[in-house]
Amino acid sequence: MLRTMLQGKLHRVKVTQADLHYEGSCAIDQDFMDAAGILENEAIDIYNVDNGERFSTYAICAERGSGIISVNGAAARRAAVGDRLIICSYVQIPDSDARSHKPNIAYFEGDNEMKRIAKAVPVQVA
């Protein structure tokens, strides 16, 4: 049996561009993609923290070091410049490997400043 597990996550990145007329996708600073292990053309899910929208698209590379998060095409109607997003990719792995699997998680603050990288989501406490 295969399980679908979180592979990579960009937590609370800020949208820098939203271009309705650009070919669909989400352009992501290459440094951010590397930190989360997200590949060019990989399917991603986007969760908009500010308006609750959830949608799927694919990742394309933005210039390394640019801080760009650009939501393009029809998805530009679901995110505005300044919105905070969570961007995730997933992987299917055998059940036997699922419990030892560690995702790549990059945390952001301010104007897309990467603050830390982790291999697990913290345990939620009461």
UniProtKB/Swiss-Prot annotation:
Catalyzes the pyruvoyl-dependent decarboxylation of aspartate to produce beta-alanine. One of its GO terms (molecular function) is aspartate 1-decarboxylase activity. SUPFAM superfamilies: ADC-like. Heterooctamer of four alpha and four beta subunits. It is found in: Cytoplasm. The gene is panD. It catalyses: L-aspartate + H(+) = beta-alanine + CO2. Its cofactor is pyruvate. Keywords: Autocatalytic cleavage, Cytoplasm, Decarboxylase, Lyase, Pantothenate biosynthesis, Pyruvate, Schiff base, Zymogen. One of its GO terms (cellular component) is cytosol. Pfam families: Asp_decarbox (PF02261). Binds 1 pyruvoyl group covalently per subunit. This is Aspartate 1-decarboxylase. The modification Pyruvic acid (Ser) is found at residue 25. Pathway: Cofactor biosynthesis; (R)-pantothenate biosynthesis; beta-alanine from L-aspartate: step 1/1. It comes from Proteus mirabilis (strain HI4320). The active site is at 25 (schiff-base intermediate with substrate), 58 (proton donor). Its EC number is 4.1.1.11. InterPro entries: Asp_de-COase-like_dom_sf, Asp_decarbox. One of its GO terms (biological process) is pantothenate biosynthetic process.
